[in-house]
Amino acid sequence: MSTSSKQLRVRETSPLRRTLTDVRHGLLGLHKALIVAEQLTFERIYGRIDSTGQLLQLVMNDPWFTWLHPLSNLVVRIDELLEDGRRLTVDEVAVLLAEVRGLIRPSELGDGFERSYYEALQRAPEVVMAHCEMKKLLSLPAL
């Protein structure tokens, strides 16, 4: 067995890598639910979004969707860590999981992400379901 095959096998079976992959998957589901919820609200006010490309441009550049950027950036950071060939450490995974826990805390009295997240949870059942899934994932032991 080649060295790269052994490294791949270690990466695939690492409990830390598996935990981070599961959390990433949950975050992507939450991110999608939030985008759909925001799209529906945006369209009620400004009219129909004509294409996926237009939606992508709005998500990246329109102030309406700016509050989602911390979640997008966290997914990118997890992707970069998972793509790195080195062995993950408990500390770096713990830091990322703490960031995820801190980010997905809705607050009626908060501002920025916390407040917008709270509002999305109030109006979109899909966001509630994705939030519950994330809470389950984050309550599982990492090792």
Language model features with spans:
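Surface-exposed peri-terminal alpha-helical interaction modules
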Residues: 2-143
